């Protein structure tokens, strides 16, 4: 089940990032010790009253304080409107109503999105500042007063957020593979989608979806059901310039959240970019299957070493997803497109694979005999056993005497051992450690 997306918008310096951090507290997931995974977080997983949602901070999209002009604010709002289910429009009670607030409100009123007007920097509810009442003029309902810096009113705001969130999406059948095509603008996502749907034996369903599902295309091939989450379809509805790459992560995030397997498209003429790394990092952190598609391979000048050199470059720049298979394709000519769904099927099998506890421990015990876990601070580390506790992605728990002493590098060694013996190509592996006797 996918989570709704809530975007915080507003002009600069009204407290968007402060509100973002206040709601998330320590919930932001940052992967440590993995080179290439960005840490400049613009989104986080939030929860209130047992309802989970994604929170997006548009304030983090343009960190350049020298370029605070309304055109940038407008792009932030448009990006949020495009991807979000609910908008938190933040205004500043101390500064009062300003023309930029009215411009943003005009844009929001023209949309069909739910909007909550949030009046920040209200330090006391006993006596509202006179400026508070001016915000009623925006025509977006009664403002909710808060102080993001001290937490005043945050609970009431989140109560309202939960009331306004859309009902959960319709769930597809368990065996339906949800595929997201992700990547930077103009990398060929639309062409790939059209190629896949135009393949022989692909039957596209004509079942209409909900508003949010309108960009989903159900189809079958050889008796297997798929859902193609078409981020290119979102783009066609957008007024956002495709040259504004920093905003494309919102589109990718919405698709990644709902997918099982992500097709990360890279432009062969440019190679992996920082933006590719960021999008890949989102997919990795969300535990999705990943296949790297190097598109426009037909126009790359090649010699006998080109394939090898290009593969090595991708592995170096996207080292944290070294498990992902790489396909060199051309969406324009159809080169190797037939391999895409074949690889999706293989990754799906790996995504759902289970290893018996007995077999898993036989392999790990043999590896630990050859390379025992090093002691830490003079204290020996004992690994008792491991077991697989979940799939999609494959998730393992290792029971030890002192979990905090087991270095991440040894956990990485155990992960590599699992991969060498059991495969899991195309999927991340999640490993946690627990003290024996813990639930």
Swiss-Prot record:
GTP 1 binds at residues 10-17, 57-61, 120-123. This is GTPase Der. One of its GO terms (biological process) is ribosome biogenesis. Residues 4-169, 177-352 form the EngA-type G domain. GTPase that plays an essential role in the late steps of ribosome biogenesis. It comes from the Bacteria. The lineage of its organism: Bacteria, Bacillati, Bacillota, Clostridia, Thermoanaerobacterales. Belongs to the TRAFAC class TrmE-Era-EngA-EngB-Septin-like GTPase superfamily. EngA (Der) GTPase family. InterPro entries: AAA+_ATPase, G_ENGA, GTP-bd, GTPase_Der, KH_dom-like, KH_dom-like_a/b, P-loop_NTPase, Small_GTP-bd.
